[in-house]
Each structure stands twice: as structure tokens, then as C-alpha cells.
From Swiss-Prot:
One MF term in the entry's GO annotations: N-acyltransferase activity
Name the UniProt record assigns to this protein: UDP-3-O-acylglucosamine N-acyltransferase
Lineage: Bacteria, Pseudomonadati, Pseudomonadota, Betaproteobacteria, Burkholderiales
Family from the record: Belongs to the transferase hexapeptide repeat family. LpxD subfamily.
Organism expressing this protein natively: Ralstonia pickettii (strain 12J)
NCBIfam families: lipid_A_lpxD (TIGR01853), PRK00892.1 (NF002060)
Subunit structure: Homotrimer.
Substrates-to-products reaction catalysed: a UDP-3-O-[(3R)-3-hydroxyacyl]-alpha-D-glucosamine + a (3R)-hydroxyacyl-[ACP] = a UDP-2-N,3-O-bis[(3R)-3-hydroxyacyl]-alpha-D-glucosamine + holo-[ACP] + H(+)
Any single GO BP term: lipid A biosynthetic process
Pathway as given in its UniProt record: Bacterial outer membrane biogenesis; LPS lipid A biosynthesis
Keyword Lipid metabolism recorded: yes
């Protein structure tokens, strides 16, 4: 399980400075890599680690290599030069993982339940205790691990992987080459209840959720994330999105292509997130908002209004500090209204005095 440095460079569209025949057996961090390993430098803050690294070769940008050469640290080393070292590292890592991957054996486990009318190609691998209901359609080479559920009339595209205990509800769509980690639920009912209360009490009346959840191609969804089905129209996650663990996407949300959402974020119903957005962990969005393309939202931020200008970076988190300092600042914040009123009174007195003079 190894590659020559030249092979890796060719697969990346990169170039080699040094020994293209060097055999690379694995990847490792700069400060841990050995002579048969490949490391990467994607941040100039770690230039010193690159200098002292024992790696057989290092993925580096042209700019950082130029810096190392100017300092006299590049000679006699092996460099794989790529415009985006971090992305190059990711692609190399994929190649090594593919080499070591457990072979996929097509077939349906004897304990799986595949109802009549479901379409499961012979190239699929269906694990133990999987349930596939009537009308469900799987693409080629779909892999479904144990205890997962695919509801009636659901659709799953080619080469998609469902880890154990994933649930795809009836009528929902998952695209090609997707990865859904354990505990993901696609298409559960959205949180829709109409209040019907009077003087004598009443109840919350459930609104049937008759839309679908539609997931595009090349989407990865982390463990225990829920994407609810739409109330009437569909909930949509477009192609290329990457969603972390424990994210809640409510009914009728629309997430634009190639947006990334970190863990524990929550997006309320009917909010539309643009393309190429970056959503930090535990960020939360009110419902019925529109967020422009390429917007970045810091972790823990609460978004309560639409963002119409593309490309901004938004933060609402109060920075951490020692607890005693936080208590003092909180006390000041509580008194801001009173301070504002006093300031307005003082301003008025100054105006009155100026007029008298």
C-alpha cells in the first residue's frame, strides 16, 4: 500500500522538486512524519515544523517553498508543490484510505427485509436487519449497513453509503455519492402544530407534513443529524454540502450547494441558506430568513434577520473571560438602559445651559 511521489503528483496535477521516485507509504503530521511518510504545510505559521520535520516529502505551496528556499531550508528535501496543499493532502489521504478499505461484497444479508416492489440492483450491499419498503429505488453500488431503514418510494443514488441505524423516510430522495453517518434521520415530520385555544383551553393541532426531504449529490451528513420533510413543499439540501453531527434542519429549509454546517447548528423552518456558506457550530437561525451566498456565521451566533449582502462574516457571541469579569460586565449591561436615560438628561441640561448663555 504505497505510491511514488511522482504518482501522487500526477494524480493531483502537482509538481515534484526532489526525488519523484520516493516511495510514500502513508501520511502523517509534520511533527510526527518519518522518512517513508508524506506531510503537508498549509499554514505559514508551521514553517518551523516543516524545517525540522523528518517527513520523506512535504506538500507545500509555491509561496511557502519560496520562503523556505530564501531561508536555505529547501535544498536536499523532497517537495510536492500544489496550489492548495490542504486540498492536495485531502485527496492523497483519500487514495490511501481507498487502498486500505475493506472490500465491498454485493448482496443482501439473510436478515434484511426487502419488500416486493423495491428495486435493489445486484451491485448493492445490504447489511443485517436492514428494511427496504415497497417502491424504494436504489442506485448501483449503494451500501446500507445494519439496522438502517429505507421507506416506501424513497430514492437513493449511485454509490451512496448509509452507515448503521440511518433512517430514510418514505418518498425522500438522497443523491449519488452521498455519505450518511449513523443516526441520521431524513424526512421525519417537521415541527408543525396550529394553536387552537380558547377561554376553556384547547390543543395544538398537528399539521400533516406532506413534502419531502431532498438531498443532492455528493452530500455528507454527520451522526445524529435530522433533516425534516417539508410541510407542503420540499426541504432541500443541494449538492456538495457537508453537514456535521447533531445538526437540526427544519421543514422547508433550503440549503444552497457546497455550504458547510458545523455541529449542533439549528436552522428553523423555511429559512433559505445561500451557496458556499460556512455555518459555525451551535449557530442558530430564526425561521423564514434568507441568507446570501458565501456568508460566514461564527459558532454560537444567533441570526434573527435576513442577510442580503453576499460574502459577509457575522458574529454575535460575547467573548469568553474570567467569570468575575463576566459578572461585572453583565451588571453593566443590565444598567445600560438607565445609563442611557441619564445621559439623555445630561445632554438636555447642557443644551438648556447653552441656550441660556
Amino acid at each position: 500500500m504505497s505510491f511514488s511521489l511522482g504518482e501522487l503528483a500526477a494524480s493531483l496535477g502537482a509538481t515534484v522538486q526532489g526525488d519523484a521516485g520516493l516511495i510514500v507509504k502513508s501520511i502523517a503530521p509534520l511533527d510526527q512524519a518519518g522518512a517513508d511518510q508524506l506531510a503537508f504545510l498549509s499554514n505559514p505559521l508551521y514553517l518551523n515544523q516543516a524545517v525540522s520535520s523528518g517527513a520523506g516529502a512535504i506538500i507545500v505551496s509555491p509561496r511557502d517553498l519560496e520562503t523556505l528556499e530564501s531561508q536555505g531550508h529547501a535544498a536536499g528535501r523532497n517537495w510536492l508543490i500544489a496550489a492548495n496543499p490542504y486540498a492536495a493532502f485531502a485527496r492523497v489521504a483519500q487514495r490511501f484510505v481507498a487502498l486500505a478499505a475493506r472490500p465491498v461484497v454485493p448482496g443482501i444479508h439473510r436478515t434484511a427485509s426487502v419488500e416486493e416492489g423495491a428495486r435493489v440492483p445486484a451491485s448493492c450491499s445490504i447489511g443485517p436487519n436492514v428494511t427496504i419498503e415497497a417502491g424504494a429505488v436504489l442506485g448501483e453500488r449503494v451500501r446500507i449497513a445494519g439496522n438502517s431503514f429505507v421507506g416506501a418510494d424513497a430514492r437513493i443514488g449511485d454509490d451512496t453509503l448509509l452507515y448503521a441505524n440511518v433512517s430514510i423516510y418514505h418518498g425522500c430522495v438522497v443523491g449519488a455519492r452521498c455519505v450518511l453517518h449513523s443516526g441520521v434521520v431524513i424526512g421525519a415530520d417537521g415541527f408543525g402544530f396550529a394553536p387552537d385555544f380558547g377561554p376553556q383551553g384547547g390543543e395544538w393541532v398537528k399539521i400533516p407534513q406532506v413534502g419531502r426531504a431532498v438531498i443532492g449529490d455528493d452530500v455528507e451528513i454527520g451522526a445524529n443529524t435530522a433533516i425534516d420533510r417539508g410541510a407542503m413543499a420540499d426541504t432541500v439540501v443541494e449538492q456538495g454540502c457537508k453537514i456535521d453531527n447533531q445538526v437540526q434542519i427544519a421543514h422547508n429549509v433550503h440549503v444552497g450547494a457546497y455550504t458547510v454546517i458545523a455541529g449542533c447548528a439549528a436552522i428553523s423552518g423555511s429559512t433559505k441558506i445561500g451557496r458556499y456558506c460556512i455555518i459555525g457550530g451551535a449557530a442558530n437561525f430564526a425561521g423564514h430568513l434568507t441568507i446570501a451566498d458565501r456568508v460566514t456565521v461564527s459558532g454560537g451566533t444567533s441570526i434573527t434577520k435576513s442577510i442580503t449582502k453576499p460574502g459577509g462574516h457575522f458574529t454575535s457571541v460575547f467573548p469568553f473571560m474570567p467569570h468575575g469579569d463576566w459578572e461585572r460586565n453583565a451588571a453593566i449591561v443590565r444598567g445600560l438602559t438607565r445609563m442611557r436615560e441619564r445621559l439623555q438628561q445630561l445632554e438636555q441640561r447642557v443644551k438648556d445651559l447653552q441656550q441660556q448663555s
